[in-house]
Amino acid sequence: MAVTPHHRLYEFAKTALIKIFAFPYATVCDLYCDGGVDTDKWGDAQIGHYIGIDASASGVNDARELWESRKKLFTSEFIELDPSADDFEAQMQEKGIQADIVCCMQHLQLCFESEEHAQKLLNNVSSLLKPGGYFVGIIPDSSTIWTKYQKNVEASHNKGLKTVPNSIRSENYVITFEVEEEKFPFFGKKYQLKFANESMFENHCLVHFPSFMRLAREAGLEYVEIQNLTEFYDDNRTQFAPLLGGYGSSLVDPRGKLVARSFDILGLYSTFVFQKPDPDAMPPIVTPELHDPENDQEEEWLWTQQASMDDGRVSRTDILPPADNEKGILGPGPADMRL
């Protein structure tokens, strides 16, 4: 069976995120490891130890069997626990597990079926991470999805229709909400996603980003970034265009820009990054990023401000880059699709 554009784009996004955050000999904990499908990506990043956690025995066994069948590039262990239901702290302390990176690449949104499940997952993440460690992954971009849905609702009202639509359609996918409603509940907003040329629906929940941030903060995690995948790609296009091209020449144009189909599909997802504070670390928390020559103008501005600060004329709050009104946690996503 041919690999669909959706799967190729998603695999690219995971690979790119791992390339940014992984480093040699790191300890990585993969929540809902899904049969260990990403172990090769972590191996390419030269990590030292991999911990695969899944809620199902089959997921854990499949991950272990896959790892055992491959070249052993790192040590590993596989644990059957539900990150959104079980209490990790006592069990992991007994094992002495502390991770540099905790990732959740494809299941976090289902934890937002209830506040209790989301809270449990984030508390578990915090207990797993070393001070200074990162929690990273990919989730549906609920801002983009909900704004598309609201546009459908508005259009139906303008047409004088009494019923509220329960779906979003494009050439590439159909999103169907279980309940027709015009409000965005913080938890439990379920929907099904079906991509063109795929027979199966995916079940998801919308992730209310402010609630995500609040629960993470209560669990002891600092918000770093939530970014729509189209922006994530554009910000790192110089580095990642060849990588994405390797997943299929039809995904980007000759200049490395996303073609319309790729933009539409990637726009449904966001990366997320949180960090567990390290009280002994200096300087303050920053987002790891790859150098992009297209950002040289901003870097020149920062150097200018740094020179002024060295002269004693600029305070710390004055040296932040100019605010970008097109980006923000309450509305990540394509510029015309923000709350």
Swiss-Prot record:
Keywords: Methyltransferase, mRNA capping, mRNA processing, Nucleus, RNA-binding, S-adenosyl-L-methionine, Transferase. Residues 1-277 form the mRNA cap 0 methyltransferase domain. The keyword Transferase applies. Residues 314-339 are annotated as: Disordered. One of its GO terms (molecular function) is RNA binding. It is found in: Nucleus. InterPro entries: mRNA_G-N7_MeTrfase_dom, RG7MT1, SAM-dependent_MTases_sf. It is an enzyme of class 2 (transferase). S-adenosyl-L-methionine binds at residues 14, 54, 82-83. GO terms for cellular component: nucleus. The record marks 41, 269 as: mRNA cap binding. Its EC number is 2.1.1.56. SUPFAM superfamilies: S-adenosyl-L-methionine-dependent methyltransferases. CDD domains: AdoMet_MTases. It catalyses: a 5'-end (5'-triphosphoguanosine)-ribonucleoside in mRNA + S-adenosyl-L-methionine = a 5'-end (N(7)-methyl 5'-triphosphoguanosine)-ribonucleoside in mRNA + S-adenosyl-L-homocysteine. The keyword RNA-binding applies. Pfam families: mRNA_G-N7_MeTrfase. Belongs to the class I-like SAM-binding methyltransferase superfamily. mRNA cap 0 methyltransferase family. This is mRNA cap guanine-N(7) methyltransferase 2. It comes from Oryza sativa subsp. japonica (Rice). The lineage of its organism: Eukaryota, Viridiplantae, Streptophyta, Embryophyta, Tracheophyta.
